[in-house]
Regions:
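Domain-level signature for soluble enzymes in the chorismate/prephenate branch of the shikimate pathway
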Residues: 1-86
Length: 86
């Protein structure tokens, strides 16, 4: 069994990577908003969001993971929309 400190250090490293990826994703979100504004498309696209969630969860058998991934990405998409509207 690994030491708790070692496990927490690994989690901290993963969190830093996730933060960097989130910032990168938000940068892409700005580009999406610019494109949508330039082409007259709506910021909110519920069909696209549902397709994205379905694609991310389709191969996951464990229900708690599937629901957690869905919740996490729905929240990220909500944050992304707010970012795009600003």
């Amino acid at each position: 069994m690994r030491d708790l400190t070692e496990i927490r250090q690994q989690i901290d490293q993963i969190d830093q990577k996730m933060l960097a990826l989130f910032k990168e994703r938000m940068g892409c979100s700005v580009e999406v908003a610019e494109y949508k504004r330039g082409t007259g498309k709506a910021i909110y696209d519920p069909v696209r969001e549902r397709q994205k969630i379905d694609a991310l969860t389709k191969d996951e058998d464990e229900l708690i993971i599937k629901k957690s991934v869905e919740e996490m990405f729905l929240q990220m998409m909500s944050i992304s929309r707010r970012y795009q509207y600003s």
